[in-house]
């Protein structure tokens, strides 16, 4: 960040700016453009023979990022370095129909995708052209096996899955001593998801449908992770966490934390879910449903 200092930002200087009346065209906090360009190719092969059908697919892509910042940089340094990431996917699967009622299936996949623009390619994309010195593609490995049953009145699907998320970029937030919120960009985060899923549809007669599902999951974080701390304006914070701006991104005085999350359950969504529904159609044009 040559020709710009963090303390030149209004948010880091005299706080009286907060009470200044803005005019049309005034800029606060940030004024930048984020540019993303992508190119890719995809191919898929499908094969069917009697009761067996299978497929394999793959893709390769390039994702490029750069930003142009009119707020924190002069014109000579407004455009950041262009960064590019190669990603790819490999997927395959097969289904075998044992007979008219029973089938089994399996799927495998591996994905390597470009890191996100913010927190991945750039350390703090809202305020700085500083790129991540060690960006990593996010990877996903997933495997699934399952069984299906079909009859005149009952359809059932049962499957088990195992998924590994590797080198994820995750954002966390907390409060600081001055009452502002701290934003932490975590990278290199791993997680493991596995579980069983069951769903069914029962139609014992033409006027009654019964549907249900059950999902049992075990999702947990598989690694600890390190992240640097910023305020809500995107400014790097010192270890005092009182709103004082650090001398630079990833500088010696830039606060960071090591999040001890290995073995902790992944939050944000239920890992055990169930549902049951009944639909009654006593006459043409009338339907009554109840769901739990």
Question: Which stretches of residues belong to each language-model region?
Answer:
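Signature of Gram-negative outer-membrane beta-barrel scaffolds
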Residues: 1-99, 124
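Surface-exposed loop/turn segments flanking beta-strands in extracellular/periplasmic regions
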Residues: 2-27, 76, 124-133, 172-185, ...
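Hydrophobic, lipid-facing positions within transmembrane beta-strands of outer-membrane proteins
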Residues: 37-43, 60, 88-92, 104, ...
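Residue-level detector of the transmembrane beta-barrel scaffold of outer-membrane proteins
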Residues: 42-44, 53-57, 91, 103-105, ...
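Gram-negative outer-membrane beta-barrel transporters
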Residues: 48-51, 162-164, 184-292
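Transmembrane beta-strands of outer-membrane beta-barrel pores
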Residues: 49-51, 60-64, 108-114, 123, ...
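Surface-exposed extracellular loop regions of Gram-negative outer-membrane beta-barrel proteins
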Residues: 62-71, 82, 96-143, 155, ...
């Amino acid at each position: 960040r040559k020709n710009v200092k963090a303390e030149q930002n209004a948010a880091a200087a005299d706080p009286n700016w907060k009470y200044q009346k803005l005019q049309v065209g005034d800029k606060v906090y940030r004024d930048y453009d984020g540019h993303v360009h992508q190119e890719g190719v995809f191919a898929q092969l499908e094969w069917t023979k009697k009761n067996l059908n299978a497929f394999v697919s793959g893709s390769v892509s390039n994702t490029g990022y750069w930003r142009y910042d009119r707020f924190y940089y002069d014109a000579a340094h407004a455009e950041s370095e262009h960064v590019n990431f190669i990603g790819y996917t490999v997927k395959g699967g097969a289904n075998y129909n044992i007979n008219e009622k029973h089938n089994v299936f399996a799927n495998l996949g591996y994905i390597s995708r470009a890191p996100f623009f913010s927190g991945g390619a750039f350390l703090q994309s809202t305020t700085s052209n500083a790129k991540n010195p060690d960006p990593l593609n996010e990877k996903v490995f997933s495997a699934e096996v399952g069984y299906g049953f079909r009859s005149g009145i009952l359809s059932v699907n049962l499957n088990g899955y195992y998924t590994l998320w590797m080198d994820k970029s995750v954002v966390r937030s907390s409060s600081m001593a001055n009452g502002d919120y701290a934003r932490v960009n975590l990278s290199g985060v791993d997680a493991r998801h596995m579980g069983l899923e069951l769903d069914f549809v029962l139609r014992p007669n033409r006027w009654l449908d019964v549907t249900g599902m059950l999902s049992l999951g075990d999702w947990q974080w598989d690694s600890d992770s390190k992240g640097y701390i910023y305020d809500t304006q995107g400014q790097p914070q010192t270890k005092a966490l009182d709103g004082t701006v650090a001398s630079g991104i990833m500088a010696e005085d830039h606060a960071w934390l090591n999040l001890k999350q290995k073995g902790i359950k992944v939050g944000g969504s239920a890992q055990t879910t169930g549902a049951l529904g009944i639909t009654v159609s006593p006459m043409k044009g009338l339907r009554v449903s109840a769901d739990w």
